[in-house]
UniProtKB/Swiss-Prot annotation:
Binding-site list for Zn(2+) 1: E122
Family: Belongs to the peptidase C1 family.
Name of this chain's protein: Procathepsin L
Organism: Mus musculus (Mouse)
Binding residue positions for Zn(2+) 3: D184, D227
């Protein structure tokens, strides 16, 4: 082959392989990298920026539709911006739904007027939003948050509990640390172990480790757990009368990855395919009509910069949207 022709072919191949970036995004890209402390090699930077730009365009399109009234929630760029949705799901969604020993069944209270809105944060039984990092330990944060609330309601003291204790020590009950687990398995571990350490004594590391539980630092315990029937009405009664509740949801969608504010409704959200454990801390409605714009108030474990300072409102009474009522439970504290 002619040398000049060969060079031309090679140059053409290189040009086709190199992503073309939207220069109008350059300032935002560099600011995003600085904010989230991203350092890449040359080849990885090209790949990550291409992903970031694709996500940014998706967010802009959605928010344009939101402004026109086509959606009830907005989206924004966040720390997950350089991740594909597949990467995102593999890293942070660690709920592993499977058959397991059931707890006691929730007995719905009779002849009780249920309030139209509840927010357990106002009662002082919810700790600040935490961040699970790149570890599939959502189940541990959901379980610890639920037990934190029950212990507060019993003792009047709000103590942050150790997720790392659960990540490292509950393998015998069926959990797999950063590779996923179940809140009910965590409650079972706490019962069998005789306690759970405080966050202060056993801090979170966002990685698997050997069990370092020390009984002298245990500040919480449970005697089992209660499973709630798979209906939103029963879940509403449990939230109103029991406290924050551990729930699982379908968190697999880009719309949730970049959720910002408003009432989340994703047409493709499943009520059965659950992959993320969260903490349900209340419910309510937007506007003046309590029969419209209803939502569940959910505490996530992706840090306070995600969503509404770490929280999300999910559509309520819309056919168990995203599955919040499918696998709800709470620990029993005597």
């Amino acid at each position: 082959m002619n040398l000049l022709l060969l060079l031309a072919v090679l140059c053409l191949g290189t040009a086709l392989a190199t992503p073309k970036f939207d220069q109008t995004f350059s300032a935002e890209w560099h600011q995003w990298k600085s904010t989230h402390r991203r350092l890449y090699g040359t080849n990885e930077e090209e790949w990550r920026r291409a992903i970031w730009e694709k996500n940014m365009r998706m967010i802009q399109l959605h928010n344009g539709e939101y402004s026109n009234g086509q959606h009830g929630f907005s989206m924004e760029m966040n720390a997950f911006g350089d991740m594909t949705n597949e990467e995102f799901r593999q890293v942070v969604n660690g709920y592993r739904h499977q058959k397991h020993k059931k707890g006691r069944l929730f007995q719905e209270p009779l002849m009780l007027k249920i309030p139209k809105s509840v927010d357990w944060r106002e009662k002082g039984c919810v700790t600040p939003v935490k961040n699970q990092g790149q570890c599939g330990s959502c189940w541990a944060f959901s379980a610890s948050g639920c037990l934190e609330g029950q212990m507060f309601l019993k003792t009047g003291k709000l103590i942050s509990l150790s997720e790392q204790n659960l990540v490292d020590c509950s393998h015998a009950q069926g959990n797999q640390g950063c590779n996923g687990g179940l809140m009910d398995f965590a409650f079972q571990y706490i019962k069998e172990n005789g306690g759970l350490d405080s966050e202060e004594s056993y801090p979170y590391e966002a990685k698997d480790g050997s069990c370092k539980y020390r009984a002298e630092f245990a500040v919480a315990n449970d005697t089992g757990f209660v499973d709630i029937p798979q209906q939103e009405k029963a879940l509403m009664k449990a939230v109103a009368t029991v406290g924050p509740i551990s729930v699982a949801m379908d968190a697999s969608h880009p719309s949730l990855q970049f959720y910002s504010s408003g009432i989340y409704y994703e047409p493709n959200c499943s009520s059965k395919n659950l992959d993320h454990g969260v903490l349900l801390v209340g419910y309510g409605y937007e506007g003046t009509d309590s029969n419209k714009n209803k939502y569940w108030l959910v505490k996530n474990s992706w840090g306070s910069e995600w969503g509404m300072e770490g929280y999300i409102k999910i559509a309520k009474d819309r056919d168990n949207h995203c599955g919040l009522a499918t696998a709800a439970s709470y620990p029993v504290v005597n």
